[in-house]
């Protein structure tokens, strides 16, 4: 039945009923149409002005689930188990092959309709205990299906609901009455005044739909920030609130010297091979270095110094010259600390950076080959591990991450070192979110920093905290070709509680 026909039937019912109203559910049943079709007709008539008045009403109704409908036709699981059993009984293994047996067996046992003989010949065997049964579950479901849910007591309804055979749903309907401009004839209201109407004068005979000045209108199309950019902005704001200065991170390409050697990472370290690092083919080698500093780094690697034995190997300038895609932004920190050491008088500093790094890693749910690293560095006299833990707790607390664990770790350029773990509610496990430590004297003293100056350093990825904040379980749903653009549109503004 077309919507216009439903609208006409609705108006005619109101006309015939005098001052009485019409219930949309009753009208749908009377006309044999879907209730939503009647609702559409009501809303269409409302748009025509004061022809009708419609009051929305809500009521509770019991409906059968898909399993409940099946049981209403075929019988309950326990009844079907009983009916499957012959007088001589049936092997339990054979009965349990039926799809209804798992639930039906336990229910039939509870009702004492059947018994299990575990000592029977050939294996456990099930027998009938009674000659006949009454399938009350099927009867109650059929009553509810016929709209007679009130004939089933509340206890039984709740039991059926517990078995997921029925659901209590809220049904919304309309009580429709005549409006001040009621008429049984439907006149289409125009929405636009066209040049043709003006030229012909036909506009005088037209009815125009009134403007709804309260309507919000269509939301304008605009750009949407990716969750990573939102969280990055919050990270940056937190660093600035804590008094940090942002470091320049425009060099994606670094020499192995600044990325590894300056950080007292030996040239035989496995992180420096092709399985973990992306090497450049052209230009393959860097040529410009602060030579005096380079010689001091070479010496501390190959011979030791500053109270350290070093690594005792033949340090190669060729290995240090190799250009790579930086594996961490700590290379930027090394450059900044070297510039700090060149100053005439030492001044305490707090630096931070947020930018991309690259590692030749296997992709999985929590790892990418290209990701963002957040770096924090504090340089001052007399700093300790306690200072580091305090700064980290304050930093992560500002991120809204309070479930933290610190685990002792090893890093070539920090001692002592700690890994930082946070609990991921989505993955239901502790996830590493950062690494930290006090920079080693073998790193700081060759730069020329005073001996009593200590440097705290920590780094974490941007992606994992973003996953935690937005409840994303797989990093490939956040970055890459599998990203759902609707997620980008719908994701709320990130506010990390201080």
Curated annotation (Swiss-Prot):
It catalyses: tRNA(Phe) + L-phenylalanine + ATP = L-phenylalanyl-tRNA(Phe) + AMP + diphosphate + H(+). Belongs to the class-II aminoacyl-tRNA synthetase family. Phe-tRNA synthetase alpha subunit type 2 subfamily. Keywords: Aminoacyl-tRNA synthetase, ATP-binding, Cytoplasm, Ligase, Magnesium, Metal-binding, Nucleotide-binding, Protein biosynthesis. L-phenylalanine binds at residues 330, 373-375, 413, 439. The keyword Heme does not apply. Gene3D superfamilies: 1.10.10.2320, 1.10.10.2330, 3.30.1370.240, Bira Bifunctional Protein, Domain 2. NCBIfam families: pheS (TIGR00468), PRK04172.1 (NF003210). It is found in: Cytoplasm. Its EC number is 6.1.1.20. One of its GO terms (cellular component) is cytoplasm. Mg(2+) binds at residue 415. Its cofactor is Mg(2+). One of its GO terms (molecular function) is ATP binding. The keyword Ligase applies. It comes from Xenopus laevis (African clawed frog). This is Phenylalanine--tRNA ligase alpha subunit A. The lineage of its organism: Eukaryota, Metazoa, Chordata, Craniata, Vertebrata. GO terms for biological process: phenylalanyl-tRNA aminoacylation; protein heterotetramerization. Heterotetramer; dimer of two heterodimers formed by alpha and beta subunits.
């Amino acid at each position: 039945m077309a919507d216009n026909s439903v609208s006409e039937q609705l108006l005619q019912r109101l006309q015939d009923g005098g001052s009485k109203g019409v219930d949309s559910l009753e009208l749908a049943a009377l006309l044999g149409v879907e209730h939503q079709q009647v609702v559409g007709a009501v809303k269409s008539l409302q748009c025509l002005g004061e022809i009708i008045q419609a009051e929305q009403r809500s009521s509770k109704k019991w409906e059968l689930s898909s399993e409940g409908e099946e049981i209403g036709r075929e019988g309950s699981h326990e009844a079907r188990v009983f009916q499957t059993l012959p007088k001589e009984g049936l092997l339990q293994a054979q009965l349990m092959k039926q799809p209804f047996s798992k639930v039906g067996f336990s229910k039939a046992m509870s009702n004492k309709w059947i018994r299990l003989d575990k000592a029977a010949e050939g294996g456990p065997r099930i027998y009938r205990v009674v000659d006949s049964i009454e399938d009350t579950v099927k009867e109650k479901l059929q009553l509810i299906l016929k709209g007679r849910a009130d004939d089933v007591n509340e206890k039984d309804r709740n039991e059926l609901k517990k078995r997921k055979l029925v659901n209590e749903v809220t049904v919304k309907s309309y009580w429709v009455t005549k409006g001040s401009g009621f008429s049984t004839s439907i006149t289409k209201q125009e929405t636009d005044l066209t040049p043709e109407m003006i030229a012909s004068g036909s506009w005088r005979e037209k009815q125009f739909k009134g403007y709804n000045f309260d309507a919000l209108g269509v939301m304008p199309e605009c750009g949407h920030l990716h969750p990573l950019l939102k969280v990055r902005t919050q990270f940056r704001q937190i660093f600035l609130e804590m008094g940090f200065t942002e470091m320049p991170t425009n060099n994606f390409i670094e020499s192995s010297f600044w990325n590894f050697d300056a950080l007292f990472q030996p040239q035989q370290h496995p992180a420096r091979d092709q399985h973990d690092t992306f090497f450049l083919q052209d230009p393959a080698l860097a040529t410009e270095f602060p030579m005096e500093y380079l010689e001091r780094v070479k010496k501390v690697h190959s011979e030791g110094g500053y109270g350290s034995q070093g690594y005792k190997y033949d340090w190669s300038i060729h290995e240090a010259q190799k250009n790579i895609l930086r594996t961490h932004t700590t290379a930027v920190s090394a450059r900044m600390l070297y510039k700090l050491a060149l100053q005439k008088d030492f001044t305490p500093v707090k630096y931070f950076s947020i930018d991309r790094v690259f590692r030749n890693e296997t992709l999985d749910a929590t790892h990418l080959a290209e990701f963002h690293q957040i770096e924090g560095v504090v340089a001052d006299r007399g700093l300790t591990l306690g200072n580091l833990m305090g700064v980290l707790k304050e930093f992560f607390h500002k991120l809204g991450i309070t479930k933290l664990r610190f685990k002792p770790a090893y890093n070539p350029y920090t001692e002592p070192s700690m890994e930082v773990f946070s609990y991921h509610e989505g993955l239901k496990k502790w996830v590493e979110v950062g690494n930290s430590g006090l920079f080693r004297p073998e790193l700081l003293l060759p730069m020329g920093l005073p001996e009593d100056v200590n440097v705290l350093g920590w780094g974490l990825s941007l992606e994992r905290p973003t996953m935690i904040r937005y409840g994303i379980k797989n990093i490939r749903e956040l970055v890459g070709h599998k990203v759902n653009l609707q997620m980008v549109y719908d994701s709320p503004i990130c506010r990390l509680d201080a």
